[in-house]
Amino acid sequence: MTPGELARMVQDGEVIRGLALGGAALAGADLSGGVFEAVDFTGADLAGARFREAILANCRFDRARLAGADLSKASLARCSLRGADLSGTRCVLTQGAECDFTGASLAQSNLTTATFATCKFDQASLAGATAIRCALASCTTAGIDLRNATLEGAALLEPDLAAARLDGTRFLRTTLNKAKLGGRDLRGIAFPACLLAEADLSGSDLTGATLAQCVLTGAALAGARLDGANLTRAVLIGAKLPGASLSGANLTQAILVGADLTGATLDGARLYQAIAPGLIAPEARFTRCDLTYADLSGANLTRANFGAAVLASANLHAIQDEGAYIPDRASAKGTDPERLRAETWHAR
């Protein structure tokens, strides 16, 4: 079948159902608005083809060549595109559900506002792709290649990025909740204003990383290295950082309510105006830290070391400080008796 013949069927409003077009030469075909059901395009040449606003259900594009194709506003359901070449495709507002992109190349593609649900992107390449406000919900992403991709405002929900290629990836306001990033070398990576709630970053090296205004609520960061990291105004409520190293990190105005810093090292870190009521930090090292105006009320600082730390006007209300070394305690605000009575009052 020629590209013109197939295009005429589409223009005539026919539902293209059950055709075997494996290996067909259909480059440049205009199939916009077509309805395709169970069509086999395996190995077909569809380079530069137009599928704008097309509906594709249960179709096979395995190893097909779709480089430069236009799939904008197309809807794909239960389609297989394993090993397909989709490099440079235009997928603006494209929707995909239960599709298999395993090993496919979407390098340099435009995925702006595209939405994919319950799809497989294992070993797929999105290198250099533009994925602004793109969403991958409940998709598998093992070994995905995101090098030099732009993920501004994108949402990858519960992504497996343990083996993802992230060199040069641009994250900005990206949702990566429950991401698997444990044990990785992420030195210098930037996650500005990203959502990493309950993400697993345990044991990862985030030395010099940019995490400003990043939401890390409940994130697992045990044993992570965050030396010199920028955590300005980051939200670390309930984050788990036992044994982590944050030497020289900037935590200015960071929110650490209920965070666990047991045995962590924060030598020379800046916690100016940090909000950390209920902080759990026994045996932590706050040596040479700037804790000016920090709120540590109710914190567990048992055997913590604040040697050479600055605590000017810091709030040390009702802290647990057994065995703690706090030489600049006089510069801080101690327990407020009236507040303590109010907090411990109970009806008789």
Positions of predicted regions on the chain:
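Tandem repeat scaffolds
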Residues: 1-348
